[in-house]
Amino acid sequence: WKVGKNILWAGFILRSFNEARFSPSVKWKAFIQYLAQWITGKEPDFYPASIVHYGTMENLEDSEKFEHCRKEAIEKGVRWLERFLVDEGNGGIKEGIAHNIDSDGKYTVLDGVRTDCTGESAGAFKMYAYLSGEKEYAALAGKMEKIVYGPMFIRGGRLDGMVRWCTNSWNVCYQDDVARALLPGLYDALYMGNCSHVEDICRAMDFLIRTTAKDGLRIFRTDNYDLTEMEMDRLRQEEHGLPSAHYNAYYHAALLLAGRASGKRQYTEVAQKGLERMMELYPETAREQSETEEMCRLILPLAVLYQSTGEEKHRQMLYRVAEDLQKVRHPFGGYREWDTGYRAAFSRESREECSVLTENGDPVADLLYSSNWLPMGFAFAYEATGDRWFHELWKDSVIFCLKTQMFSDRTHLDGAWCRAFDMDLKEAYAAPHDVGWAAYACETGWTVSEILMGMMMPDILKKRK
């Protein structure tokens, strides 16, 4: 604001406007140019180039260019992941980058080691090795898996099979995080011929089942200090768990794939009960971030459920969710965040985690909690149904990722995807209230590795055949 006639006062540091990626960039560019003219009396001679541009400029409707860009995006994503390894993979991988950018344009690196991020990133490396023939990535994945199935995995006693959340929350178990850490081991067993982790994965599923309610749903997490035999029995005897795709859908996907890998019918039965219960309540499930997230999270497990049972009612569940999801598709290719009634746990919060929409209709896609799951989900849906519509949805979701991947000479950004993308502005921009994972956050696991695996899965499935 102006103080007198010749002083402009700013309540925050402006000098890092470019490095800190102030957005919307068009508005900030106009404002910075105005300041320069006000100070100097003339139009500025130049404006600094953005440190990030989003996506390829190629025509992705052309099949050859699509395949070239997909291959390039996978390679860039794999290189980005390598930059966050701990001790060359022997210590796992860092979580990624937080939303926060300080006054000098420095990013906050989330350097804790999470089991889910480590397992997911190992999965991306292993798929890349399988398809490219670059064996060093398979060796790298093997080192990372020693973290997942080593110190993060309890063996023996009443907690046998419990998988730890992360290095600074040693006794916490989120079944969603466990599932995402272990699903790559199931992809490996079922589609790449390596069954070395199936026995341990079954132990982890057995532990989760021992703390799952009668309806096939688990509470959002368990803490080891609470889990006496009496408490575990109480959890099993509860009629209902938490009907949330955020917390339970990928647990069910892991159960179903573990059932196929091991032949244990119980896994399929528990997953079927849980998914059928959620679909009884759908779309009024217990939302964490948004209604869009719940739909995106359900595609993979419902596809695997139909693949496992062949039942028409399960096919109809898959199509119902996939068709509902199209109602929030944006012309740019992503899916708008939507939350009917704003009932999600983190809807429009300002003190902790927060969804990225301010109101329904915002043209914002969430690549941490929603759109990131779709390449893998649609790949499995096509595999389960043979319906070309799902193949086109897979391709559409990949094209969206190709148009939102970051290109930059800053190595901590180049090749990654950030959490939120405004599909009108065509840049990262959204409600900034989340304390750690707002628009600019980049997760090694949840986002980058999941997108990469989803991009590669059709090739894995084709190679198996």
Task: Give the residues covered by each predicted segment.
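Solvent-exposed loop and edge beta-strand segments that line ligand/cofactor-binding
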Residues: 101-118, 163-180, 188, 230-248, ...
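Active-site lining segments of carbohydrate-active enzymes
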Residues: 190, 195, 206-261, 265, ...
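Well-ordered alpha-helical scaffold segments within catalytic/enzyme domains
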Residues: 53-68, 119-135, 180-196, 249-264, ...
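Extended, well-ordered alpha-helical scaffold segments
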Residues: 27-34, 50-54, 66-84, 133-151, ...
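Extended glycan-interaction surfaces of carbohydrate-active proteins
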Residues: 88-106, 266-280, 313-366, 431-444, ...
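CBM-like carbohydrate-recognition segments
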Residues: 154-157, 337-342, 391-465
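Low-complexity, Ser/Thr/Pro/Gly-enriched N-terminal "stalk/linker" regions
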Residues: 37, 41-117, 135-168, 200-228, ...
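A glycine-centered loop/beta-turn motif at secondary-structure junctions
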Residues: 1-50
